[in-house]
Amino acid sequence: MNTKTVKSMAGIVLSQISLVALFPLCICYQTHQSTSSVASLSPQFYENSCPNAQAIVQSYVANAYFNDPRMAASILRLHFHDCFVNGCDASVLLDSSGTMESEKRSNANRDSARGFEVIDEIKSALENECPETVSCADLLALVARDSIVICGGPSWEVYLGRRDAREASLIGSMENIPSPESTLQTILTMFNFQGLDLTDLVALLGSHTIGNSRCIGFRQRLYNHTGNNDPDQTLNQDYASMLQQGCPISGNDQNLFNLDYVTPTKFDNYYYKNLVNFRGLLSSDEILFTQSIETMEMVKYYAENEGAFFEQFAKSMVKMGNISPLTGTDGEIRRICRRVNHDV
């Protein structure tokens, strides 16, 4: 199916769209809820109120991907950055308003978070189909899954029924999202704070098998990793030389580099294979193979067993997607994802 065809389908009755036509064949992993705090979430939440919701989302994700393959990683990243700040409540999508400062202004998001226009477009289509029904938080969970699938990764049932926050937390976004230079212990502490464990950490960082990083995100590894003008000794020298050609010691801050230089747009296990060969782009990636025997063994296992990685990734995505959801009468269903309803 070409891009023109997908565009023409976006506005028609999407309940008849075949998932096989839009997405590559994939393995769907069954996952299960395990805590009472998310018992009100269900894969069938919109079965009666908006039965075409998932087909609409899938169609628009496909269109966005065909227009810009980078978008898959970008909208997946929004879900991560949302869930790590006061739970999966779509607070990352809110623009600044009045005294509320947007999470988009944090170091983790400023000049790098993207895909907001795609979310706006999908939300508009959902509002036309089922007004004030599908939350922006659920939309982020769905686009994350569909972005993985369209890149060749695993699928899973997305539990739905989240509601949207009325507030953003710039401070939370500054404090709770790991940086490219974070130590393994710092990253693990942040994951543990969200109820995620070491297994989840290693699996979820595998999402870096797609996407990009700016030069500014890893330059220190190339030239001054220890603070003594020395490069990172855990970085393959040939790979480092290649990176230095496009990421000099100064300038070119915004130059983009693939997180996985072998299969940059395919969701597979090459992320782990690269780490084994000391060709992880970010310091916060390579440390999985260099700072802990336990994580090293997991990296080697996933490098050799893509199916095991896919299965654990799906489980960990469900677990992450269930972090502190607003349900029942908490929060609201935003009509526009960038603004709370009283500002619309």
UniProtKB/Swiss-Prot annotation:
Keywords: Calcium, Disulfide bond, Glycoprotein, Heme, Hydrogen peroxide, Iron, Metal-binding, Oxidoreductase, Peroxidase, Secreted, Signal. The keyword Cell inner membrane does not apply. GO terms for biological process: cell wall polysaccharide catabolic process; hydrogen peroxide catabolic process; mucilage extrusion from seed coat; plant-type cell wall modification; response to oxidative stress. Residues 1-28 form the signal peptide. Heme b binds at residue 208. Its cofactor is heme b; Ca(2+). Ca(2+) 2 binds at residues 209, 260, 263, 268. InterPro entries: Haem_peroxidase (IPR002016), Haem_peroxidase_sf (IPR010255), Peroxidase_pln (IPR000823), Peroxidases_AS (IPR019794), Peroxidases_heam-ligand_BS (IPR019793), Secretory_peroxidase (IPR033905). Glycans are attached at residue 224. Binds 1 heme b (iron(II)-protoporphyrin IX) group per subunit. Binds 2 calcium ions per subunit. One of its GO terms (molecular function) is peroxidase activity. The record marks 77 as: Transition state stabilizer. One of its GO terms (cellular component) is plant-type cell wall. SUPFAM superfamilies: Heme-dependent peroxidases (SSF48113). It is found in: Secreted. It catalyses: 2 a phenolic donor + H2O2 = 2 a phenolic radical donor + 2 H2O. Belongs to the peroxidase family. Classical plant (class III) peroxidase subfamily. There are 73 peroxidase genes in A.thaliana. This is Peroxidase 36. It comes from Arabidopsis thaliana (Mouse-ear cress). The gene is PER36.
